[in-house]
Each structure stands twice: as C-alpha cells, then as structure tokens.
C-alpha cells in the first residue's frame, strides 16, 4: 500500500468492471457507508477512503494551509484515483465530498463518469437571491461553540444534523465519528466547509451529476438542490427523498439506499 492509500485508509473491495468511489462528509468517516456497501460489492469494485482530518486519520498529516480550502481535498481524491490506476469511476459524494468530487472533475473529467451528490451545497451562507440555510452570525456562533466546548457542541449538533434524538443509533454513530476528530482540526474543517462558496465553478462542470436531497435537512434546504440543478453546466437531475436529516444514508437506509442504487445504475434520461 502506498503512502497516499495508507494516509487515507483506502480500502478496495468487491468485484466488477465498473468502479464506485465513496466520499464521506464532515464529522464522519468511511463507516458512514456501511448500509450501502453490501449492495454494491457483488457488482462493482468499491473504493472507500477517509478525508484527511477525519478521526480515523493521523492528525499529524493534517496540513492546516492545504485544507483551508476544498482544493486540497480534491487533489487528495485525484491522487487516490491515480494511485489505484482508476481510469474512470462513479463517484458518490456525501455533503462536502460532493463538492470535492465536482472540483476534482474540473481538473480531471476523464476520471469520472458520473457524480452522485448526497446532501450537497455549493454555499451554506445566505446571499442576495440565494438561500444557503445559514446567516453568517449563525456560523460565527457555531464556530465559537466548537472552540469553547467541543464535546458539548458534538452532543448538541449530532441530533440536529441527523434528525433524531440521542437514543437513535444513527445519532450515536454520528456523535462517535464527530467526537473522534481532534477539536482544532474539526474547527478548521468546519470553517473551510461552511465558509466555502463554489457557486462560480458550477457552470464549468461537465460530468453528469445526480443530486439527492432529504426533504428536511438542517444544513441544506431543498432550494439548494434546485440551485445546483439550474446552475451546473452538465446534465443533472434532482431527486428529493422523503427522509429527515443531513446523513440520510445512515439515518434512513431503508428508503434512501434504493434511491442511491437507482442513480448509480441508471444514467440521466435525456
């Protein structure tokens, strides 16, 4: 195993001609895909990895400058694909990884046959004629809460993000992976994600995008998915799923996994 693969805990499982690469969002790691993977391994080669900064990665490898914007993560993704000699893949990106996949596809469109985006947003802060879901003051308070008492913030944020109470297995799972992050890294990653603005790159995307969205999501209003659909330069399709929360593949697998599989298996009908 190479340095890049080891640093990102890369796992390759399953068998099939087509390759699926699964990218996780903030506060999670590759375990967030545990309900989806069993449905893929018989038909696809499946690549799992952890974004740098996840609690499962070595915090000494986290370069605060490199990961102060999403481009650093997109270069990591390209490096993983190149190391594995993947010529083309279906990329399934949750939350920030959806936008990381989009960024990577701008540099290397040949590596991606389609991008399946789950709970994706190009910008989280409201703007003129744009509803991102947060005011800047909301985010300032969020960052201060992370800074002042990370564990307390995790316990409060997890049920809101997942859509459930602390008795929920999905909330407990997200709390675990969120709390695994080193607090200073979590703050840095959170600031990078929530302050990002990817709207300007959307018209230049050429790889087809399948946009999947919970009907109720604390972090991403449904109008954001419609914005992506309207502004992406590529072929795109939106499906709003009757699920609650920002991590539907973890919290509502019975209703969400079949939808993800359908978008993996079927291309956009023109």
UniProtKB/Swiss-Prot annotation:
Alphabetically ordered keywords of this record: Cytoplasm, Hydrolase, Nucleus
Observed effect of gene inactivation: Increased seed dormancy. Long hypocotyl phenotype under red, far-red, and blue light.
Tissue: In young seedlings, expressed in hypocotyls and roots. In adult plants, expressed in rosette leaves, stigma, sepals and silique peduncles and tips.
Gene3D superfamilies: alpha/beta hydrolase
Entry's induction text: By red light.
Family named by the database record: Belongs to the AB hydrolase superfamily.
Record protein name field: Probable esterase KAI2
Taxonomic lineage of the native organism: Eukaryota, Viridiplantae, Streptophyta, Embryophyta, Tracheophyta
């Amino acid at each position: 195993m190479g340095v890049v693969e080891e640093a990102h805990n890369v796992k390759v499982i399953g068998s099939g001609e087509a390759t699926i690469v699964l990218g996780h969002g903030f506060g999670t790691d590759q375990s967030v895909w545990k309900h989806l993977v069993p449905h893929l391994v018989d038909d696809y080669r499946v690549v799992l990895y952890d974004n740098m900064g996840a609690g499962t990665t070595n915090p000494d490898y986290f370069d605060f400058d490199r990961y102060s914007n999403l481009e650093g993560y997109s270069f990591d993704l390209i490096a993983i694909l190149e190391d594995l000699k993947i010529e083309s893949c279906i990329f399934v990106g949750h939350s920030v990884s959806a936008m990381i996949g989009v960024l990577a596809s701008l540099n290397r469109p040949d590596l991606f046959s389609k991008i399946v985006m789950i709970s994706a947003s190009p910008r989280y802060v409201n703007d003129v004629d744009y509803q991102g879901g947060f005011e800047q003051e909301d985010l300032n308070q969020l960052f201060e809460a992370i800074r002042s008492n990370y564990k307390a913030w995790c316990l409060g944020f997890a049920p809101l993000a997942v859509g459930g109470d602390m008795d929920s297995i999905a909330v407990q799972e997200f709390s675990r992976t969120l709390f695994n992050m080193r607090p200073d890294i979590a703050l840095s990653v959170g600031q990078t994600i929530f302050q990002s603005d990817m709207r300007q790159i959307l018209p230049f995307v050429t790889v087809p995008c399948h946009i999947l969205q919970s009907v109720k999501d604390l972090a991403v209003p449904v109008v954001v998915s419609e914005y992506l659909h309207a502004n992406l330069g590529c072929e795109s399709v939106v499906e709003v799923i009757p699920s609650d929360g920002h991590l539907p593949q973890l919290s509502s697998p019975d209703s969400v996994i079949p939808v993800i599989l359908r978008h993996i298996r079927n291309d956009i009908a023109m």
